[in-house]
């Protein structure tokens, strides 16, 4: 039996591979059974932090409600495009299309804004959040726009909208059932 003497990571790989094989053969019940096994095994290996994420999101929502809009004139600063959405919703495609423009720098999935926000909170607000963020971007040309599709930018959307004058937020949305199935079938490296 191929499953004997395998560690959890190897079992996850086997279950996902089996699921894909059964799916290609049109044997959807067997495919689903292996998907359930793979995802259950992944939950054993990587505990869900959903409660922590929900709590953090709620706290940041309250912070954004209390955050004053930055009305300073920042014409000399670049446009920051934040792309938010669930994994497997099309955000990578959107970022790729936007980044075809030579005046757009693709930052990928970096948490520069979260780091800037933490620094802003620790500095007791002596420095402007948008200035901290733009310094971390290290963009010297104000005509260069940036895209950032870090998975957790949605938590900061309210603060981004108020703190970064030249920010644009693009919410990528896909049918939730399609999205859930796509995430469930995807074998991400972690989590």
Place the predicted regions along the sequence by residue.
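PAPS-dependent sulfotransferase catalytic domain
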Residues: 101-107, 111-123, 140-191
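Alpha-helical solenoid repeat scaffolds of the TPR/TPR-like class and their adjacent stem/linker regions
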Residues: 1-140
């Amino acid at each position: 039996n191929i499953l004997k003497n395998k560690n959890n990571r190897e079992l996850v790989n086997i279950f996902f591979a089996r699921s894909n094989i059964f799916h290609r053969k049109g044997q959807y019940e067997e495919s689903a059974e292996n998907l359930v096994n793979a995802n259950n095994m992944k939950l054993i290996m990587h505990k869900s932090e959903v409660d922590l994420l929900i709590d953090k999101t709620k706290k940041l929502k309250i912070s954004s409600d209390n955050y004053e809009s930055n009305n300073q004139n920042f014409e000399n600063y670049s446009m920051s495009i934040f792309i938010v959405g669930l994994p497997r919703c099309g955000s990578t495609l959107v970022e790729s299309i936007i980044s075809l423009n030579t005046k757009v720098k693709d930052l990928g999935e970096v948490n520069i804004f979260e780091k800037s926000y933490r620094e802003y909170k620790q500095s007791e607000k002596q420095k402007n959040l948008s200035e901290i963020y733009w310094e971390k971007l290290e963009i010297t040309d104000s005509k260069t726009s940036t895209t950032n599709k870090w998975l957790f930018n949605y938590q900061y959307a309210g603060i981004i909208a108020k703190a970064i004058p030249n920010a644009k937020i693009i919410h990528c949305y896909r049918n939730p059932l399609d999205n859930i199935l796509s995430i469930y079938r995807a074998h991400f490296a972690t989590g």
